[in-house]
Amino acid sequence: MRQIVPKVVVVGAGMGGLASAIRLARAGCEVTLLEAREAPGGRMRTLPSVAGPVDAGPTVLTLREVFDDIFEVCGQKLDHHLTLLPQPLLARHWWLDGSTLDLTTDLEANVEAVAAFAGAREARAFRRFHDLSARLYDAFDRPMMRAARPDLRAIATGALKAPRTWPALLPGMTLDRLLRLFFRDRRLRQLFGRYATYVGGTPYGAPGVLALIWAAEARGVWAIEGGMHRLALALARLADDQGVRLRYGAPVARILRQGGRATGVQLADGRTLPADHIVFNGDPAALLAGCLGDGPQDAVPEDRIHPRSLSAWVWSYAARASGPPLVHHNVFFADDPRREFGPIAAGQMPEDATLYICAEDRSGGQLPDGPERFEIIMNGPPGRPAKPEDFAQCRSRTFDRLRQFGLTFDPVPGETSLTAPSGFASLFPASQGSIYGLSPHGALASLKRPLARTALPGLWLAGGGAHPGAGVPMAALSGRHAAEAILADLASRSR
């Protein structure tokens, strides 16, 4: 008897879509991957510059084992496809009073650096914070981040075995409040509080458990030679090798539904593709908003989508830099975090912004000869419509501020180098410009993200808007969860 090959359509070639397509094709499914734009990557996008394509999306690669696994499943090695450069110096941090702090992957070096920066008392506090972060990471890694569905029993058991994690798990314990239990120095609270923005939150609303992000970074950070977008290109090539049909410039207009099940997709040009299963690698808010027709509008509950996480103003450009010695990852802190996050909460551009700079051509430790590529990120509110004065205001609040640190660029980038919250809203339908999906604020926010399986049979989710959440490795893990759920469903039907 001839075996029927399952047909899967993956909508969106972001990290989650690529990861799911690769695994499903490797398992024997007939996979078609549809991408509206002309290149893979989703939020891992680029803008042109005189120095070559410059990243305009994620800049930090952690948990490389997630990507090693994708290639190993296919009998290949990640290092044969990409050059990953370990970054022992995680980031250089700057304050306007002239103080700086380098943090690395070496705990003892960090303790010494914090002691020189803020004194012996704060160095001891840092060691205790590092220990808490590592314990939180160990407690939540497998039952939360690596699991297809958060395993509450395993999380509770892990927490009970690690009583030192309890303060971070108390109701109402925000990241800012937790940091105040450790650090007297406001600069250290500001530094580690910034980790809330990694998942689209603020230290005043995000739960204390997000302290585990420090441990994830301390385990290792890598740069990719040529830029982060090279990862998306490598995964697309791997998908092609596995037999995935990649179709770029193929926007999907509708997800089709018949008999209470997702049955295929209709492209913007009117053509239809039938499918046994569909993986939607996009913001789940687009389903609820009807951006893909009325068929999947009830696939995801609204409380799994709203409220929204932060957006950003992102500069991507090439220039010559003069001033303080930049490394690959740099953070120039605001004088007063309340003047950053207060306006953002009110839907406004921050008055006193913390600015993150990725100097992506400095990953090898050498100064480039000529213009080099930069990405600067300033946090912003979601749902903010574009205003005529935004560009001039953002340019001033970015580059005038950096000039106060002695950092200048020649030339200063123009309007085509800036992606505003309204730009992200246009790029990612129904997202309201939110970069990270559901807001991480509240103790249970991480448990509310939609899982791979939706309420509409045959429709599955992947991407940063689904469990386990925002970030490059998290999005890739969501693709794994979607693929494994589909394969489990197929196996159960074949019995």
UniProtKB/Swiss-Prot annotation:
One of its GO terms (molecular function) is oxidoreductase activity, acting on the CH-CH group of donors. Pathway: Carotenoid biosynthesis; spheroidene biosynthesis. InterPro entries: Amino_oxidase (IPR002937), carotdesatCrtD (IPR054841), Carotenoid/retinoid_OxRdtase (IPR014105), FAD/NAD-bd_sf (IPR036188), Phytoene_DH_bac_CS (IPR008150). It comes from the Bacteria. One of its GO terms (biological process) is chlorophyll biosynthetic process. Its EC number is 1.3.99.27. Keywords: Carotenoid biosynthesis, Chlorophyll biosynthesis, Oxidoreductase, Photosynthesis. It prefer the acyclic carotenoids such as 1-hydroxylycopene, and 1-hydroxy-gamma-carotene, whereas 1-hydroxy-3,4-didehydrolycopene and 1,1-dihydroxylycopene are much less effective. PANTHER family: 4,4'-DIAPONEUROSPORENE OXYGENASE (PTHR43734:SF7), PHYTOENE DESATURASE (PTHR43734). Belongs to the carotenoid/retinoid oxidoreductase family. This is Hydroxyneurosporene desaturase. It comes from Cereibacter sphaeroides (strain ATCC 17023 / DSM 158 / JCM 6121 / CCUG 31486 / LMG 2827 / NBRC 12203 / NCIMB 8253 / ATH 2.4.1.) (Rhodobacter sphaeroides).
